[in-house]
C-alpha cells in the first residue's frame, strides 16, 4: 500500500476501542456530566463536557483508535459548536425561494431527483475525508474533522441534539456552496441554475435528517422516515451501523445508493487519501455546476419534446382536487 493511503490513515478498530464505543453508543449524556458546571447548561455544552471527560479518562498511544481526536480535546479543542441560528434560517428561506422561483414544477422535480442522487455520492466523499485523522489539523476542514470523528466516540450526540442543531452543522458548507454557485456561476440571476443549487441544498438537509433518524431507536424513529427507509429512499440503520463498526464502509447518509460503488473505490481502486481530498475539493467547487451543465439540456428535451411538463402539471392539479 502506498504512503498516504486511506487504510493507513484510519487506525484499525481494536476490540478494546470497539467495546468502548459500544459502551457509549446508547448512553444518554451522563448525569454526572450534565451536572458538571451550570445546571442550565445546554446540550452542546453538556456534550463538550462529556467529550472532555472521555478524553481525560482515555489512555492511549499514537495509532490507537480515536487517539488523535481525543488528544486534541485533551489539548483544549472544542468539539461541538454553537451555531448561528439566523444564518441557518436565511439559508432555509432562500432554499425555498430558489426552488419555488425555478422555471417550472417539472424542472424543480427533475432537479430534486438528480441532486438527491448526487448529494448521496458527495456526502460519501465528504464523509471519507472528514473521517481521516490525518486531516484533523488541516486548515478550513480541521474543525469539521474533529466533530465528525468524535461522532464515532459519542454516536448518540446526533440524537440528543435536536434537528436544528444537526441542520445548522451545515452552515459553513452551505454558505460555501451558495457562494460558489450563486455568485461565481451566475446563479443569482439565472432561475434555472438557482433552482438546481437550492435543490442540492435541500437534499443536503435531508441527508442530515436521514443520518439522525438512522441513529434513532425504532420506537423514537419518525414513522414517515421509517417507511422511506423501508423503501430504500433514506439510509437504513443497518447500512449506517456498518460504518460505525469498521469505518471503511457505509459512508453515504442520505439514501445509501452509493454505498457499494464508493466502498469498492475506497477499498480497492483509490488508495490515496490525497486523491479523496482532491475529489472532495473538486466536487465542492464544481460538482453542482457540472451537474447543472448536464441537467439543463436534459430538462429542455424532457419538458419540450417529451411532454413531461403537461403530465406533471396535470398530476399536480389532480392531486389538489
Residue spans for each PLM region:
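Non-catalytic, topology-defining segments of multipass membrane proteins
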Residues: 2-200, 204, 209, 231-321
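Interfacial helix-loop-helix junctions of multi-pass membrane proteins
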Residues: 214, 218-225, 249
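Short, mixed-charge amphipathic alpha-helical segments
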Residues: 224-232
Amino acid at each position: 500500500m502506498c504512503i498516504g493511503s486511506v487504510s493507513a490513515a484510519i487506525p484499525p478498530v481494536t476490540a478494546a476501542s470497539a467495546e468502548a464505543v459500544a459502551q457509549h453508543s446508547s448512553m444518554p449524556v451522563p448525569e454526572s456530566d450534565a451536572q458538571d458546571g451550570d445546571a442550565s447548561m445546554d446540550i452542546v455544552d453538556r456534550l463538550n463536557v462529556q467529550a472532555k471527560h472521555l478524553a481525560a479518562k482515555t489512555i492511549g498511544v499514537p495509532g490507537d483508535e480515536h487517539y488523535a481526536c481525543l488528544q486534541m480535546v485533551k489539548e483544549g479543542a472544542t468539539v461541538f459548536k454553537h451555531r448561528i441560528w439566523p444564518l441557518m434560517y436565511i439559508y432555509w428561506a432562500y432554499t425555498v425561494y430558489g426552488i419555488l422561483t425555478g422555471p417550472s414544477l417539472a424542472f424543480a422535480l427533475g432537479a430534486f431527483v438528480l441532486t438527491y442522487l448526487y448529494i448521496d455520492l458527495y456526502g460519501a466523499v465528504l464523509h471519507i475525508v472528514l473521517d481521516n485523522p490525518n486531516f484533523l489539523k488541516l486548515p478550513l476542514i480541521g474543525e469539521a474533522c474533529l466533530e465528525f470523528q468524535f461522532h464515532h466516540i459519542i454516536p448518540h450526540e446526533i440524537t440528543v441534539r435536536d434537528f436544528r442543531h444537526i441542520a445548522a452543522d451545515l452552515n459553513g458548507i452551505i454558505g460555501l456552496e451558495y457562494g460558489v454557485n450563486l455568485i461565481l456561476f451566475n446563479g443569482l440571476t439565472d432561475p434555472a441554475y438557482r433552482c438546481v443549487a437550492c435543490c442540492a441544498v435541500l437534499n443536503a438537509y435531508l441527508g442530515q435528517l436521514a443520518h439522525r433518524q438512522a441513529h434513532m431507536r425504532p420506537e423514537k424513529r419518525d414513522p414517515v422516515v421509517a417507511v422511506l427507509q423501508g423503501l430504500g429512499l433514506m439510509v437504513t440503520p443497518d447500512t449506517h451501523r456498518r460504518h460505525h463498526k469498521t469505518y471503511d464502509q457505509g459512508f453515504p447518509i442520505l439514501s445509501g445508493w452509493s454505498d457499494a460503488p464508493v466502498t469498492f473505490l475506497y477499498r480497492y481502486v483509490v488508495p490515496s487519501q490525497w486523491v479523496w481530498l482532491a475529489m472532495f475539493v473538486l466536487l465542492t467547487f464544481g460538482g453542482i455546476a457540472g451537474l447543472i451543465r448536464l441537467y439543463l439540456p436534459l430538462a429542455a428535451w424532457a419538458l419540450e419534446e417529451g411532454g413531461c411538463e403537461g403530465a406533471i402539471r396535470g398530476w399536480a392539479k389532480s392531486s389538489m382536487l
